[in-house]
């Protein structure tokens, strides 16, 4: 089975203001538990960007606990790790862009949303649960799907689940399913993604 997810942001404390967790440890452990309860060792997961927050070392102790065959489509917070090449320990492929077939459905994968009206679906991350200008645009593009954990119950989801969760988010039904984080007004993102910063993908080390 194929699953999709994005914007985990392991170890990133500022996101607590827009997520329903009291601590980074609670957030990280919930994301890992939800992942492993959903994904079997034989399943495939496309992580559409933003493992953590682009600084220091790769979060090895967290990535090593995630099950399944994993593929990373890099986000703007996946390019600045001091040991970025070590990501190949956990991901079978690392790209900035990918195209796959999920059954008979064609899928375009990129961290940033792309206007897409062709066959299949475009799956992205980056915008979290933002209700900014992009919300009004993307709600008119039902083939462009947000895989971010913030609107997908903090777990990887299938294409069918992704379609339904996005429909609920852009129709307003999602607001009744997931309450806003404490001290955050409903519909207020509280944090805006950084400007995209593309850097070369590190070469796969010999032997990995």
Question: What do the predicted segments below correspond to?
Answer:
Residues 87-179, 184:
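Conserved beta-sheet core of the metallophosphoesterase superfamily
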Residues 57, 61, 129, 133-136, ...:
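Residue-identity detector for glutamine
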Residues 3-101:
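Core catalytic region of metal-dependent phosphoesterases/phosphodiesterases
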């Amino acid at each position: 089975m194929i699953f999709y997810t994005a914007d985990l942001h392991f170890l990133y404390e500022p996101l607590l203001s827009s997520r329903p967790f009291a601590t980074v440890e609670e957030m990280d452990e919930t994301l890992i538990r939800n992942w492993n309860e959903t994904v079997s060792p034989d399943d495939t997961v496309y992580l559409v960007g933003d493992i953590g927050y682009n600084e220091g070392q790769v979060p090895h102790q967290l990535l090593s606990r995630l099950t399944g065959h994993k593929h990373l489509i890099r986000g703007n917070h996946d390019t600045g790790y001091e040991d970025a090449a070590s990501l190949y320990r956990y991901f079978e492929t690392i790209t900035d862009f990918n195209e796959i077939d999920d059954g008979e459905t064609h899928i375009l994968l990129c961290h940033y949303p792309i206007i897409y009206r062709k066959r299949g679906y475009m799956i992205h991350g980056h915008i979290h649960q933002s209700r900014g200008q992009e919300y009004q645009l993307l709600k008119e593009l039902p083939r462009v799907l947000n895989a971010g954990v913030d609107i997908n119950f903090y777990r990887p989801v299938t294409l069918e689940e992704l379609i339904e969760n996005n429909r609920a988010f852009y129709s307003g039904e999602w607001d009744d399913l997931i309450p806003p984080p404490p001290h955050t007004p409903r519909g207020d993102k509280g944090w805006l993604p950084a400007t995209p910063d593309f850097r070369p993908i590190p070469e796969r080390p010999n032997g990995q």
